[in-house]
């Protein structure tokens, strides 16, 4: 047999070469802040769809979470989210950050390269960079 077959350094190099490129990227992920304003008794988040594209989640799924956390009704209309009630930027941004922590960032490596997949009756947050899977509860 070839002695390189069991050589530790050769095995390590081979294993590292098979890892996806995302593992080696050290790019800082930043969620854009909500651009919101109050109009009458409603709050509008102007860049809601843009935020959902950055975090790579469906706007309806993301909106459902924000609405539940704020305890209000609302709807996605075009590129914005309309909330019933008056909410400040701080509270909206804190709910967005909480969503990102629970449903976007990998619990193992902290990267945002994740997908929500379903296996059987259980939904998982699967990291495409490191391969970790975490069970999550849907909204």
UniProtKB/Swiss-Prot annotation:
GO terms for molecular function: translation initiation factor activity. Keywords: Initiation factor, Protein biosynthesis. Pfam families: eIF-5_eIF-2B. It comes from the Archaea. Disulfide bonds: none annotated. InterPro entries: IF2/IF5, TIF2_bsu_arc, Transl_init_fac_IF2/IF5_dom, Transl_init_fac_IF2/IF5_N, Transl_init_fac_IF2/IF5_Zn-bd. HAMAP family: eIF_2_beta. PANTHER family: EUKARYOTIC TRANSLATION INITIATION FACTOR, EUKARYOTIC TRANSLATION INITIATION FACTOR 2 SUBUNIT 2. eIF-2 functions in the early steps of protein synthesis by forming a ternary complex with GTP and initiator tRNA. Belongs to the eIF-2-beta/eIF-5 family. Heterotrimer composed of an alpha, a beta and a gamma chain. This is Translation initiation factor 2 subunit beta. It comes from Methanococcus aeolicus (strain ATCC BAA-1280 / DSM 17508 / OCM 812 / Nankai-3).
């Amino acid at each position: 047999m070839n002695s390189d077959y069991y050589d530790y350094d050769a095995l390590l190099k081979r294993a590292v070469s098979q890892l996806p490129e995302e593992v080696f990227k050290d790019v800082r992920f930043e969620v854009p802040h909500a651009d919101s304003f109050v109009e009458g008794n409603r709050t509008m988040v102007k860049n809601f769809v843009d935020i959902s594209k950055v975090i790579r989640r469906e706007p309806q799924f993301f909106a459902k979470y924000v609405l539940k956390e704020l305890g209000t009704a609302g709807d996605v209309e075009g590129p914005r989210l309309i909330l019933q009630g008056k909410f400040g930027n701080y509270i909206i941004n804190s709910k967005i950050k909480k969503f990102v922590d629970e449903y976007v960032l990998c619990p193992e490596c902290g990267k945002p390269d994740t997908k929500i997949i379903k296996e059987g009756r259980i939904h998982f947050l699967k990291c495409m960079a490191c391969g970790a899977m975490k069970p999550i509860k849907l909204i």
